[in-house]
């Protein structure tokens, strides 16, 4: 039977994958994807702990995190499209020469 520790180990591994993606990538789209992976690892942990304690609060919070993450991605990708139209690049290095 799959227990709580299995889910928490999975959530930890997914979290580490997201952290490595954030630290290693210079592309802004990949940074967005990596941050979504981090949020999904938190959702896995919340849902697993919620199921373990027979409480729906964690699953409800995970549902709201998914909804907020979807709106975050929509706004973030819109900003990235505008940035690409302005600079022609979506590299993290292209953001260092912003002028106010």
From Swiss-Prot:
InterPro entries: NADH_UbQ_OxRdtase_chain4L/K, NUOK/Mnh_C1-like. One of its GO terms (molecular function) is quinone binding. The chain crosses the membrane at residues 2-22, 29-49, 60-80. GO terms for cellular component: NADH dehydrogenase complex; plasma membrane. It comes from the Bacteria. Coiled coil: none annotated. It is found in: Cell inner membrane. Gene3D superfamilies: 1.10.287.3510. One of its GO terms (biological process) is ATP synthesis coupled electron transport. Keywords: Cell inner membrane, Cell membrane, Membrane, NAD, Quinone, Translocase, Transmembrane, Transmembrane helix, Transport, Ubiquinone. Its EC number is 7.1.1.-. It is a multi-pass membrane protein. It catalyses: a quinone + NADH + 5 H(+)(in) = a quinol + NAD(+) + 4 H(+)(out). NDH-1 is composed of 14 different subunits. Subunits NuoA, H, J, K, L, M, N constitute the membrane sector of the complex. Belongs to the complex I subunit 4L family. HAMAP family: NDH1_NuoK. NDH-1 shuttles electrons from NADH, via FMN and iron-sulfur (Fe-S) centers, to quinones in the respiratory chain. The immediate electron acceptor for the enzyme in this species is believed to be ubiquinone. Couples the redox reaction to proton translocation (for every two electrons transferred, four hydrogen ions are translocated across the cytoplasmic membrane), and thus conserves the redox energy in a proton gradient. This is NADH-quinone oxidoreductase subunit K. The lineage of its organism: Bacteria, Pseudomonadati, Campylobacterota, Epsilonproteobacteria, Campylobacterales.
């Amino acid at each position: 039977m799959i227990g709580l520790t299995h889910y928490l180990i999975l959530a930890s591994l997914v979290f580490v994958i997201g952290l490595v993606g954030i630290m290693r990538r210079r592309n802004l789209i990949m940074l967005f994807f990596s941050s979504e992976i981090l949020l999904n690892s938190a959702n896995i942990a919340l849902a697993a702990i919620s199921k373990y304690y027979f409480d729906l609060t964690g699953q409800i919070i995970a549902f709201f995190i998914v909804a907020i993450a979807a709106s975050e991605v929509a706004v973030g990708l819109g900003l990235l499209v505008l940035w690409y139209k302005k600079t022609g690049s979506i590299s993290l290095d292209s953001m260092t020469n912003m002028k106010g």
